[in-house]
C-alpha cells in the first residue's frame, strides 16, 4: 500500500467490511516489510512504523464501529 493512509475521520466513513479489507491489506504489507527487513532489502524502515500505525488506526475505528 504505497498511497497515503486515510485519516481517522476518513476511515470512520468506511463500512466495517471495507475496514476489515484494509486491515488485511495492511497485515500483508507488514508481513512483506518484515521479510524485507530480515533480508536487508527494506529501503525505508520508517515505512514499517507507518504501516503499523496505519493498521492500529484502522483497527481502532473498526472496534469503535462494532461497539457502537
UniProtKB/Swiss-Prot annotation:
GO biological process, any: translation
Please tell me whether the keyword Ribosomal protein is annotated for this protein.
Answer: yes
Question: What residue spans carry the region label Disordered?
Answer: 32-68
Q: Locations of Basic and acidic residues compositional bias? A: 45-56
This protein's UniProt keywords: Ribonucleoprotein, Ribosomal protein
Q: InterPro entries given for it?
A: Ribosomal_uL29, Ribosomal_uL29_sf
Which GO CC terms are listed, alphabetically?
ribonucleoprotein complex; ribosome
Family of this protein: Belongs to the universal ribosomal protein uL29 family.
Q: What is this protein called?
A: Large ribosomal subunit protein uL29
Q: What is the lineage of its organism?
A: Bacteria, Pseudomonadati, Myxococcota, Myxococcia, Myxococcales
User: Gene symbol?
Assistant: rpmC
Amino acid at each position: 500500500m504505497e498511497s497515503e493512509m486515510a485519516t481517522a475521520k476518513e476511515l470512520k466513513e468506511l463500512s466495517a467490511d471495507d475496514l476489515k479489507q484494509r486491515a488485511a491489506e495492511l497485515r500483508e504489507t507488514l508481513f512483506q516489510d518484515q521479510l524485507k527487513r530480515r533480508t536487508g532489502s527494506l529501503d525505508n524502515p520508517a515505512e514499517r512504523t507507518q504501516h503499523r500505525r496505519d493498521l492500529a488506526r484502522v483497527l481502532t475505528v473498526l472496534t469503535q464501529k462494532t461497539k457502537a
